[in-house]
Regions:
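Basic, amphipathic "hinge/linker" alpha-helix immediately C-terminal to the N-terminal HTH DNA-binding motif
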Residues: 74-93
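Amphipathic alpha-helical dimerization/coiled-coil segments
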Residues: 87-114
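Short, contiguous hydrophobic alpha-helices characteristic of membrane insertion segments
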Residues: 4-6, 61-62, 113-114
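N-terminal helix-turn-helix DNA-binding core of bacterial DNA-binding proteins
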Residues: 6-49
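Basic amphipathic alpha-helical segments that dock to polyanions
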Residues: 50-57
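Intrinsically disordered, low-complexity serine/threonine- and proline-rich regulatory segments
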Residues: 1-10, 92
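Beta-hairpin "wing" of winged helix-turn-helix
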Residues: 58-75, 80
Length: 114
């Protein structure tokens, strides 16, 4: 059985935004499970992490929410990406691409790819 690790600091917002971009509206539990699945079940997203992140993203205007009914007929808050959220995804992806390129220089010395 694989050991799960907590989501890396500073990455959850991007993972949430990219999940909503790819999947469309989802409730918090669905977002958390999708992030875990996408990571190959290497990452663990708990309620104490996902819901504060969703609240912050909503306050920033990157996502919006509305109440709906889940697959098991329970009331659930569904989150969707806003126009501002789509622009933020682009910005964050560019930043992570730069960060990844920089880290690659440290992990593979001698390979200058920037």
């Amino acid at each position: 059985m694989k050991n799960k690790t907590d989501v890396w600091q500073g990455t959850l917002a991007l993972m949430v935004l990219k999940t909503l971009e790819a999947m469309g509206p989802l409730h918090g539990y669905g977002i958390a499970r999708r992030i875990e699945q996408t990571s190959g079940n290497h990452l663990s997203v708990n309620y104490g992490t996902i819901y504060p992140a969703l609240l912050k993203l909503e306050q920033e205007g990157y996502i919006a929410s509305e109440w709906g009914v889940s697959d098991n007929n329970r009331r659930a808050k569904y989150y969707r990406l806003t126009r501002a959220g789509r622009k933020q995804v682009e910005r964050e992806v560019q930043e992570w691409e730069k960060t990844t390129a920089i880290l690659t220089r440290f992990l593979s010395p001698g390979k200058e790819s920037l």
